[in-house]
């Protein structure tokens, strides 16, 4: 709509691997784009570097803040993070999970321990805790301790085998509802849940019921 009503030219580039991040961002600079939007935390370094080198270009980064390389958030004059309070949705998921579990154990795990992942896990933990307080129950959360910020991570957003293995571990410990926060790795967890037959998966980032019908029920 903005292309026709405002006369804005829009360029797009899709990254097929990490090696594409920098060239894709720089191609936008070369094409004369004055607002460049990176989608996803993986593009943080490429967008950050380009913003430092091109002060007359504006940048935005979806789903991640900018950092100094040591996980300390930094502010850039010509770039802004676009972050969403996903803890709120995860809180509701945690509350419902605590109310639905038949074993008294639910679980969550992440891909990599970064803020855009742990914010989901924090919200889920708060939801479980709120249900326990409201209902006088003692539902246990596996995979994440909000207070210590310690938990389970696959160190990958791609390897579905790792998601399956992590879910199987939780299932063996008694969890019957699992919320993976690990992109496609979560589909491995869904496969484990389907194979078990008594475990439910909570999807993030999209409507998994529609996006992954093989695991809908």
Protein language model regions, located:
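A residue-level marker of the well-folded mature domains of exported/periplasmic proteins
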Residues: 1-217
């Amino acid at each position: 709509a903005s292309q026709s009503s405002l006369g804005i030219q829009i360029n797009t580039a899709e990254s097929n691997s990490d090696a594409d991040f920098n060239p894709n961002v720089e191609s936008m600079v070369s094409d004369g784009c004055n607002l460049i939007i990176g989608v996803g935390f993986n593009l943080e370094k490429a967008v950050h570097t380009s913003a430092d080198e091109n002060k007359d270009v504006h940048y935005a980064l979806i789903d991640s803040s900018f950092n100094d390389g040591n996980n300390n958030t930094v502010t850039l004059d010509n770039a802004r993070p676009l972050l969403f309070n996903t803890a709120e949705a995860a809180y509701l998921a945690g509350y419902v999970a605590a109310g639905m579990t038949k074993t008294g154990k639910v679980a969550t795990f992440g891909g990599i321990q970064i803020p855009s992942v742990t914010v989901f896990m924090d919200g889920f933990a708060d939801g479980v805790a709120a249900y326990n307080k409201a209902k006088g129950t003692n539902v246990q959360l596996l995979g994440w301790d909000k207070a210590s910020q310690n938990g389970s991570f696959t160190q990958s957003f791609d390897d579905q085998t790792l998601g399956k293995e992590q879910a199987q571990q939780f299932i063996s410990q008694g969890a019957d509802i699992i919320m993976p926060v690990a992109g496609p790795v979560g589909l491995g967890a869904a496969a484990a849940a389907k194979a078990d037959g008594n475990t439910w998966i909570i999807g993030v980032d999209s409507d998994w019921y529609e996006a992954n019908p093989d695991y809908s029920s």
